[in-house]
């Protein structure tokens, strides 16, 4: 071979690879926290725990339709678009290309949290935004509301969206008419022209929509000045973080597995991939850099809005879970529907995400029950089905097979180790582990940081 002649050392290389460079996976691994049910599992709390010694905390998908609550020093912070890990003053927060950003919402959220306590001081210097992230405009949000109204009028039911413009902006993205952060900060004249075209498209689709185009552009110019120092090439930033000195990088998933656009209970889902694949596409990183994948599971099941919910308890049990768990959406304030834990759903979420461990939250909400049911199988026409149905009509028809476990009927909110939990509470956790074949790493028994019991 000519190459071998010009490179005599090549012949001594193993496998006869003639000195060709070989790509080897390397670099830091990212730790991922994902919701395993329909959202509101307590992801923010797990992220808050892990963010205490993290260097970078990332958001990879969704927008300000998510809602995370974190309590630090008795101050309750609410996050929708910002990674909740930004509460740690030593953390760099990164909003990836898969996230959709409503600029007024971003600044409003930051300013509200700054007024609550010291957790967000200096946030503007600690936030990096991918230049490839798409922008949510006010008319996307207005169109979201109109679409919901139309669904209600035409079909008698809507999707129960948060009306934050998430569906419309992802539609613009897929239609290649959306605008990104790089457009805003690089060439405002070019951005303005494209904004006018997009706004006029929306006005022609929704004749009742009123858009003050010049007024909007004036506002956006003001936001552009403020946001410009935060906008960076996200792919390059993350590559440097992965391949530079050792760093702890945390990814905070928004929404949850059963709300995923592909794998969720479609059409009652969000518009992004909130399963593990969305981490790679939403940040611009290869799958071999994904390390631990933690699934966050509430000790029972909740869902906001309409859609199939096999283990729902539309009765006193559901009401007790709702009031004890204070089940109201952080983003919408809507009451959450409540039911027993569903292991069929969790096995399905695990098939997609490959959870390495679980965080089981709000176990203390079950303190009042003398017996607790867990959904272990679905039956259709009297036969057990081995999968989680994709079709909503089919999912609505399944009959859940339950396993009844004895409750502990005692307050566990002061437990700080696994051994301090009553035996029946320990058995409940072990039953979940055995059925799912995934270890439980944390158990939540209250709202504060201290009330997360770590098992290993």
UniProtKB/Swiss-Prot annotation:
| Organism of provenance | Sus scrofa (Pig)
Which residues catalyse the reaction?
40, 68
Query: Where are the residues of the annotated region Disordered?
Result: 1-24
Q: Which cofactor does it need?
A: Mg(2+)
Q: How does it assemble?
A: Homodimer.
* Name the UniProt record assigns to this protein: Adenylosuccinate synthetase isozyme 2
Please state the pathway this protein functions in, per its UniProt record: Purine metabolism; AMP biosynthesis via de novo pathway; AMP from IMP: step 1/2
Class in the EC hierarchy, top level = ligase
What does the record give as EC number? 6.3.4.4
């Amino acid at each position: 071979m000519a190459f071998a002649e010009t490179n005599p050392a090549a012949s001594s290389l193993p496998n006869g690879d003639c000195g060709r460079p070989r790509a080897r996976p390397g670099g830091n691994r990212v730790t991922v926290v994902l919701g395993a049910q329909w959202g509101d599992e307590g992801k923010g709390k797990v992220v808050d725990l892990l963010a205490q010694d993290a260097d970078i905390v990332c958001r990879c998908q969704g927008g300000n339709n998510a809602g995370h609550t974190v309590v630090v020093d008795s101050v309750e912070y609410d996050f929708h678009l910002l990674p909740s890990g930004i509460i740690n003053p030593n953390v760099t927060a990164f909003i990836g290309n898969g996230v959709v950003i409503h600029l007024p919402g971003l600044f409003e959220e930051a300013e509200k949290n700054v007024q609550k306590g010291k957790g967000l001081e200096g946030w503007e210097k600690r936030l990096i935004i991918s230049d490839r992230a798409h922008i949510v405009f006010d008319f996307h949000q207005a169109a979201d509301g109109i679409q919901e109204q139309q669904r209600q009028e035409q079909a008698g039911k809507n999707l129960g969206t948060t009306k934050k413009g998430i569906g419309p902006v992802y539609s613009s993205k897929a239609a290649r008419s959306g605008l990104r952060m790089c457009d805003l900060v690089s060439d405002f004249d070019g951005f303005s022209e494209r904004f006018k075209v997009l706004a006029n498209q929306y006005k022609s689709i929704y004749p009742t929509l009123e858009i003050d185009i010049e007024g909007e552009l004036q506002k956006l110019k003001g936001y552009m000045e403020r946001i410009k120092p935060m906008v960076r090439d996200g792919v390059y930033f993350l590559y440097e973080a992965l391949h530079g000195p050792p760093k702890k990088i945390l990814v905070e998933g928004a929404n949850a597995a059963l709300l995923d656009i592909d794998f969720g209970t479609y059409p009652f889902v969000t518009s992004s991939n909130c399963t593990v694949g969305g981490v790679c596409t939403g940040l611009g990183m290869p799958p071999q850099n994904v390390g631990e994948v933690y699934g966050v599971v509430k000790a029972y099941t909740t869902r906001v809005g309409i859609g199939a919910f096999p283990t729902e308890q539309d009765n006193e049990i559901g009401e007790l879970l709702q009031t004890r768990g204070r089940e109201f959406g952080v983003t919408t304030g809507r009451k959450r529907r409540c039911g027993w834990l569903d292991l069929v759903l969790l096995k399905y979420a695990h098939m997609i995400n490959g959870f390495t461990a679980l965080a089981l939250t709000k176990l203390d909400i079950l303190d009042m029950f003398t017996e607790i049911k867990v959904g272990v199988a679905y039956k259709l026409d009297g036969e057990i089905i081995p999968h989680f149905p994709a079709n909503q009509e089919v999912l609505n028809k399944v009959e859940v097979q339950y396993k009844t476990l004895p409750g502990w009927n005692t307050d566990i909110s002061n437990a700080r180790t696994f051994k301090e939990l009553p035996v029946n509470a320990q058995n409940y956790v072990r039953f979940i582990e055995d059925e799912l074949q995934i270890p439980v790493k944390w158990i939540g028994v209250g709202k504060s940081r201290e009330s997360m019991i770590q098992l290993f």
